[in-house]
A protein has these predicted regions:
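Catalytic and substrate-binding clefts that recognize carbohydrates or anionic sugar/phosphate headgroups
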Residues: 1-133, 143-144, 149, 156-161
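Aromatic-lined carbohydrate-binding/catalytic grooves of carbohydrate-active enzymes
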Residues: 130-270
Length: 270
């Protein structure tokens, strides 16, 4: 089956694809719910342009597929943490394939009679999230570009005016001071407690997003704390890893370290 497959990867598996086969899953990806005829890359990326079908990677990479046919359904979980690739018939309608840059070819075939059976088998392998609070399952309004608290409150008010159910308003990175995590832009967003209380009075929860990058900015409390505590990810040479995101040059907490996870939990609960 591998003959003629253009994706020649160190780790690869090719599967026969039936004519009625549909594909779902893979996490945060462009395109329709049915991923047939698409190709994707499992490599988390923050693309600032419009998310058209041509983008193969977005924010999340979940190498888990649910395959639905007229008479059957099954799942495949590819257990590989390296940069990987999925082609679901875009190259050829006779097959689909998965490839990775390195690692082992480990994958799980999950059988069942229904989609919920497949999801149950997948979460049995990977772990299950506790049942969240009810409001988290409602409608959430989230977008980049609300440049002030007044803008967010205006949108929230419109939901109530039009009697459209909405449980939560999200604050994107504009609420931060210079895109520094765990800060607040008081100039445009005012008093945080007051702003959030105004939304609560109208029945909204507020969610303030947190980005993974910490601005490389000596004198900025979270940066200085991370350097002093040796909290940030490093290169193979032992230097703190630096790459640019929204604040410019940034460093990244190494959540593989227990002390970093503990620090993160403490900050979020304060």
């Amino acid at each position: 089956m591998s003959a003629g497959v253009s994706g020649s990867y160190p780790v690869q598996t090719v599967k026969k694809m039936d004519g009625d086969e549909k594909f779902y899953g893979l996490g945060d990806k462009t395109g329709f719910l049915n991923k047939r005829d698409y190709e994707y890359e499992n490599w988390n990326s923050d693309i600032p342009q419009a998310h058209t079908d041509s983008y193969r990677a977005l924010y999340k990479s979940i190498p888990f597929l649910i395959t639905l046919k007229k008479e059957s359904v099954y799942g495949i979980f590819f257990d590989n943490t390296y940069r990987s690739y999925v082609n679901l018939g875009k190259e050829n309608q006779a097959y689909f394939y998965y490839g990775a840059d390195a690692g082992n070819l480990d994958y799980y075939f999950i059988a069942g009679d229904t989609m919920p059976d497949i999801v149950g088998g997948y979460t049995y392998l990977t772990g299950r999230t506790p049942l969240p609070q009810l409001w988290t399952l409602g409608y959430h309004q989230s977008r980049w570009g609300y440049d002030s608290a007044d803008c967010i409150k205006k949108v929230a008010g419109k939901y109530r005016e039009l009697d459209i159910p909405c449980d939560t308003m999200h604050f994107d990175i504009d609420y931060m001071d210079g895109y520094r995590v765990f800060t607040w832009n008081e100039k445009d967003y005012g008093d945080p407690a007051g702003t959030i209380q105004e939304l609560a009075d109208e029945g909204f929860k507020a969610v303030c997003i947190i980005d993974p990058g910490v601005k490389l900015d000596p004198g900025y409390e979270k940066y200085d704390e991370g350097i002093a505590g040796d909290y940030f990810a490093k290169t193979p040479e032992g230097e703190v890893y630096v790459n640019a995101v929204w604040p410019g040059d940034s460093v990244y907490p190494d959540f593989g370290q227990p002390k970093v996870r503990k620090c993160g939990q403490k900050i979020r609960s304060s």
